[in-house]
Amino acid sequence: MAKYNIVEKKQKEAVYRTLVSPKMMDEMKEKILRVIVMEKKYKDKNYSAKKLAEDLGTNTRYISAVVNVCFHMNYTSFVNKFRIEEAMAILVDRRYQGLRMEEVSDMVGFANRQSFYASFYKQMNMTPREYRLQQLAQHPLERVAKPSKKTAKKS
């Protein structure tokens, strides 16, 4: 069965490569990264592949092709990757220690806590809570909120 999946995946990638020229693939990859990462559209719960395609003046089939070939994952996994990365930073930042997981989930763009937990576990092989506890135990004094400029001047 595993052999079948590998062959199927290679065939799918080959079809995508014929759909989009290499030059257009590179250009679209950069545009997708700019919008999703630099403009932080991953934080928008409602920012779909369809909306991204509209913003880039293309269609979802091209978006899907570029994401699959260039990033080796589907659109949802691609967006969730950046959400999880931001969540990881928030979870260990002492300024946000009072936040509930629902609030962290909302801040990074997940529709609900369940999808946040499922995506986090899939990517990190532990729950967000386990990650927070592990990181804080390993680095107890790091990630303390930086003093404000007012406080720093008085010292």
Model-derived regions: residue spans:
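Key DNA-contact positions within bacterial/archaeal DNA-binding proteins
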Residues: 61, 113-114
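Short, polar N-cap/turn motifs at the start of nucleic acid-interacting alpha helices
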Residues: 102, 112-113
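Membrane-proximal linker segments that couple transmembrane helices to downstream signaling/catalytic modules
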Residues: 2-94, 98, 102-103, 119-122, ...
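The short coil/loop that forms the "turn" connecting the two helices of the helix-turn-helix
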Residues: 58, 110-111
